[in-house]
Swiss-Prot record:
GO molecular function: nucleic acid binding; tRNA (adenine-N6)-methyltransferase activity
Name of this chain's protein: tRNA1(Val) (adenine(37)-N6)-methyltransferase
Described purpose of this protein according to its UniProt entry: Specifically methylates the adenine in position 37 of tRNA(1)(Val) (anticodon cmo5UAC).
Keyword Transferase in record: yes
Subcellular location: Cytoplasm
Coiled-coil ranges (or none): none
Listed EC numbers: 2.1.1.223
PANTHER family named among the record's database cross-references: TRNA1(VAL) (ADENINE(37)-N6)-METHYLTRANSFERASE
Organism: Vibrio parahaemolyticus serotype O3:K6 (strain RIMD 2210633)
Length: 239
């Protein structure tokens, strides 16, 4: 996947590799946490919205051996990277990627689970690199439209999992509740014990339900916390 253009740094996990190509989308801790934290029935059809390099789809394929995963992205370079990563994974027969805007995506079936690391820069200048600007600037996929789209793509018992910074996450959840969603799971994430919550992992359900709440601290005084290691050890090489 080499060319004269900027190449995004790759990343090796225990069972698969991520090559970023020209996507401008490096592997993020947010994405790894979400992929490790989300839950899914088995078997299931899972949709990864805004797949980027395919990280979440690949994590789902590893965790849920009976699931079929469809990934969509609007960026050509992202689709190229995801397609490469899928084809070189052990689960290539259960993974597919489509170059499309999810707002016009019309699949033949509904999904039991959706996973998405949404864009969240609501203000300020767009990122200098155009692909990352598309990946992270809310104008490319507004949250209200994303929620309505997810609601239509899920089956009646379906759920959708997301990760966002705390301010954007609280606004996203508030908006979801006004649209008829229920908050089924919520995990507040702190970078360390002495730092405040900076991320929310959350799951939305179409059916009424109670909220299961939890808490995660990423770093302890001597490295990653035991909880973070337990969550991600199936993926990171050195855990």
């Amino acid at each position: 996947m080499k060319s004269g253009k900027f190449q995004t740094k790759g990343f090796k996990f225990k069972q698969f590799c991520i090559e970023g190509g020209e996507s401008g989308m490096p592997v993020s801790t947010d994405g790894v946490m979400l992929g490790a934290w989300m839950e899914s029935p088995s078997p299931a059809h899972i949709l990864d919205i805004g797949t980027g390099t395919g990280l979440l789809a690949l994590m789902c394929a590893q965790r849920f051996p009976d699931a079929k995963i469809t990934a969509v992205d609007i960026e050509t370079t992202a689709v190229e990277a995801a397609s490469h990563n899928f084809s070189h994974s052990p689960w290539h027969d259960r993974l597919s990627v489509q170059h499309t805007d999810v707002l016009i995506f019309s699949p033949p079936q509904r999904f039991q689970r959706i996973v998405c690391n949404p864009p969240y820069f609501n203000t300020g200048e767009q990122a200098k690199q155009s692909q990352r600007a598309t990946a992270r600037h809310t104008d490319s996929l507004r949250h209200d439209a994303l929620l309505k789209c997810c609601y239509q793509l899920l089956d009646a018992e379906g759920k959708a999992s997301f990760v966002l910074p705390i301010t954007e996450g609280e606004l996203f959840i508030e908006l979801a509740l006004t649209q008829g969603w229920s908050l089924s799971r919520l995990c507040r994430v702190q970078p360390s014990e002495k730092k405040p919550v900076h991320r929310l992992l959350f799951e939305l359900a179409k059916q009424p339900c109670d909220t299961q709440e939890s808490h995660l601290i990423i770093h302890s005084s001597d490295g990653y916390s035991d909880d973070f290691v337990r969550l991600t050890h199936e993926f990171y090489l050195k855990m």
